[in-house]
Amino acid sequence: MWQVSGAHGAIDPVRAVDAMLAYHDAGFFTWDLADHYGPAEDLIGDFRRRFAASRGAERLSEIQAFTKWVPYPGRMTRRTVEDAISVSRRRMGVDRLDLLQFHWWDYSDRGYLDALRHLADLRDEGQIRHLALTNFDTERLRIIADHGIRVVSNQVQYSLIDRRPDARMAAFCGDHKITLLAYGTLLGGLLSEKYFGRPEPQRSELNTASLQKYKNMIDAWGGWKLFQELLTVVNGIAEKHQVSIANVGVRYVVDRPAVAGVIVGARLGIAQHLADNARTFGFALDEADFQLIEAVLVKSRDLMTVIGDCGDEYR
């Protein structure tokens, strides 16, 4: 639900919840959001109320809403942490958060360990079901594990062009029973038929924050010419399986070791891709597909060297 935070088109709350109901009816039950994604947590609250009224309160357990807490730098007291979690629970209309994903801006400030200890206490007390992370690197995962703090997942950027989790993180997560939730898998929409065969777009043509962000990632990875080479290969694979380019991109990542799910953005009330998204689960990539993809990817730059580990682009 990052798209409701701004720079992706105006969101009408009623139409947005209409779209959320349609997604649920199509079998998409889990939402990813954050405390700072504009009205995202409030929309979850509205969605739950309308869902209970129209589908029955007894079915509310079908809905999963994975939110995030992204605190400002400062001292992490029990009061600070609990107050923030209480705000999210109130906005979302729940007694307990399904999954709380914690983000921290500055690793030199070890206050993230204090915050996580308090969050773990709140989990044990029943205010949070599962504790998780977002955009933490492998070294910080190790430190957190060494301090005995149990987390179930880490949300990181993971796509055909950004395979940094493969370098260190996936193996660490496998050893410590931590899963990965992947975002950025469709590069904000650039990994699609719309951009296949197109000249390199000017920045003024990229009309959402996501398109601008992931065009920068493509530039760091290898540039537009190599990206078109990748799209050519992926389009051929998509035609072979009678699916879309986006389906191939998601299938590739969801099958990676340690990946528990892929987050696909939705411009609620503006653009929906219900039927196309569902096709992701109706086919499998074969060894020939992987070889064709790898033949292009080996020509790219190593983003671990260019950017650093997962999440380093935010620090």
Enumerate the predicted regions with their spans:
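Terminal-tail/helix-coil boundary detector
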Residues: 175-179, 201-236, 240, 255-261, ...
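Conserved, mostly hydrophobic/aromatic
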Residues: 23, 31, 44, 65, ...
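N-terminal binding-site loop/beta-alpha segment at the start of enzyme catalytic domains
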Residues: 1-63
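A short, structured active-site edge motif that brings together acidic residues
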Residues: 59-73, 100-103
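Glycine/proline-rich, positively charged
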Residues: 11, 21, 25, 74-167, ...
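Aromatic-lined glycan-binding groove of carbohydrate-active enzymes
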Residues: 165-210, 244
